[in-house]
């Protein structure tokens, strides 16, 4: 009996304990296992695969139900903050691209070009990217759920939500209950994050190591340094301009609870449930974050803008092409537009590099070699990119919600 109660007490402590501390323990154990036994580390990679698979499985249903329930139960006259969040997303992405241009000129990198992959096809132009985004809006809803097409899911969720506004209260309550049930499943999956990250870290270190990355040390330093600058300086400045108080407690909370998980899952879509849970913890408006978080996972791509810009300018420096200031500014705009469409392209930000390279007349075969370099450094580049993208979704959502709360409180005091 005593053993059972002790076991129950241990499980209770694990279930109610700090998730961040448990993730750090999983991280350390994963590194140790990869160091001690590569075969065992590769074997436990299944735990990471299962965790990421569970997150990807629950995320589309979560987005559909939350957005649908939010709009169906939206009261007339009740205000959401989607527009200011959209502006923050766009400003953050463009600022990241500008920062990447500045870093690339201050610390010019060159590439050891390798054979590019021939079995992947990049988009043919920005028009092609925008066309793919528009087509994803009219996707079959079942197909959108199966493939994780969040633009299509959002369109259907918004449409069904507006249609259900005219339904009776029983129907609306059912939608709310379904939303709560999916949220419960999400919380259950997130509790397994320490085990999942343990498996991901162990298998990644065991299979790839970091030996191949040393040849691209400077390029990685420019990429990661730029992402750190955006996360710790540029984004806090944008948030400060919005909320008019110290932004760093909010910034560090988002990096700690969203960025860490996103770093290891390397998937903005898989991190949507984590971000939703963090928004709830921050007591943000559910009607707002249920739309802004999946939307951010689709279009808020500061990390992708940095990757596209830095790798393109590295190719430019390698080939000795001169770049003036207006062209660099135009590259920032192009990289921002490409980044916003990265979620609709198989291969993400890397396969949009040929679009940016095309601005400088770089042939497609060389551009695809740059893409191949991107895949080589992807272990770190993609992890940092996803961590920046996903944590910024919560950061800007929280900033807009808190600014609106402060405005309403100030208005109430004046009256």
UniProtKB/Swiss-Prot annotation:
Domain of life of the organism encoding this protein: Bacteria
Annotated catalysed reactions: L-serine(in) + Na(+)(in) = L-serine(out) + Na(+)(out); L-threonine(in) + Na(+)(in) = L-threonine(out) + Na(+)(out)
Keywords, in A-Z order: Amino-acid transport, Cell inner membrane, Cell membrane, Membrane, Symport, Transmembrane, Transmembrane helix, Transport
InterPro entries in the cross-refs: Na-dicarboxylate_symporter, Na:dicarbo_symporter_sf, Ser_Thr_transp_SstT
Compartments (UniProt record): Cell inner membrane
GO molecular function: neutral L-amino acid:sodium symporter activity
Topology with respect to the bilayer: Multi-pass membrane protein
Pfam families given in the database record: SDF
Disulfide bonds: none
Gene Ontology CC terms: plasma membrane
PANTHER family on file: PROTON/GLUTAMATE-ASPARTATE SYMPORTER, SERINE_THREONINE TRANSPORTER SSTT
NCBIfam families: PRK13628.1 (NF010151)
The protein, known as: Serine/threonine transporter SstT
Organism field: Cronobacter sakazakii (strain ATCC BAA-894)
Phylogenetic placement of the source organism: Bacteria, Pseudomonadati, Pseudomonadota, Gammaproteobacteria, Enterobacterales
